[in-house]
């Protein structure tokens, strides 16, 4: 007896997630849809470092020290690792409210604010929350249908609410939030060191070659070095400046979004409730604090009803490996109406007839 097993396609949650993100590797990689500038970042880093390792490092390792290419390789690998970690991870996206949850929140808001007359603007949907004796406003997101947590904001590019939203960075192709900010900071810090390192040793390389064949002749023989110097020179100021700005933000335990909006500028005696008043403590919390898990559950499996079929019940899940028999009664409830009438009582059985006596005549 042969048994035919029918396997249905599993639908994972990342396939149905709203927002403007792209997923790769079965939901393990999450990025924004606009990735053109991210590819430019990869091209500039890989191209510049390839030229540096191919030409300058070989000459400098012989003339000066073999440790020069070793340190360059360490900075390059660390920069690439932190870049990919920032670009491919969940920045802290907050799931949107389910239809039932959104309806409940709407009812709660209407009960609190009352009916708004037609033609009048409804009052702002805000909840007050106290953190370290400071009132923080929780704003309602009309797209995600939720009250955003403190420091969260909605990214207009990715169309998602992100926890501790810092900014959307097209150079890494992703939002920068609570779950990938530390990797973003380490990326720009290591990239600054790598840019300074490559730029400095390119100058040393040109100086050493110029002592032997002259400056102009060196420029003619090494066009790749000239290209590296130009790339490093123009990117050095922006990368180093960005690193300094984010170092300032880390020391204050503040985000780029809060700095642009002036949330904690000290006006009206409003101070940053998240700052510990100590640079070391702020740096430890931002860069070394516990990393929260992703709440998206991108690789989770959707129930069958949400992916186009009916979800299995608990009893079906426990007996899915057993041979399938007739459908249970509850599965037929949609086709046959439930009989709610009282069944008629069965009449009691009649007592058996007594045995008849046999007379002498019948014998």
UniProtKB/Swiss-Prot annotation:
Residues 57-63, 205-228 are lumenal. Its EC number is 2.3.1.225. The chain crosses the membrane at residues 36-56, 64-84, 184-204, 229-249. The active site is at 169 (s-palmitoyl cysteine intermediate). Residues 303-363 are annotated as: Disordered. InterPro entries: Palmitoyltrfase_DHHC, PFA4/ZDH16/20/ERF2-like. The keyword Transferase applies. Residues 139-189 form the DHHC domain. Residues 310-322 have a biased composition (Polar residues). It catalyses: L-cysteinyl-[protein] + hexadecanoyl-CoA = S-hexadecanoyl-L-cysteinyl-[protein] + CoA. Palmitoyltransferase that catalyzes the addition of palmitate onto various protein substrates, such as ADRB2, GSDMD, HRAS, NRAS and CGAS. The ZDHHC9-GOLGA7 complex is a palmitoyltransferase specific for HRAS and NRAS. May have a palmitoyltransferase activity toward the beta-2 adrenergic receptor/ADRB2 and therefore regulate G protein-coupled receptor signaling. Acts as a regulator of innate immunity by catalyzing palmitoylation of CGAS, thereby promoting CGAS homodimerization and cyclic GMP-AMP synthase activity. Belongs to the DHHC palmitoyltransferase family. ERF2/ZDHHC9 subfamily. This is Palmitoyltransferase ZDHHC9. It comes from Bos taurus (Bovine). The gene is ZDHHC9.
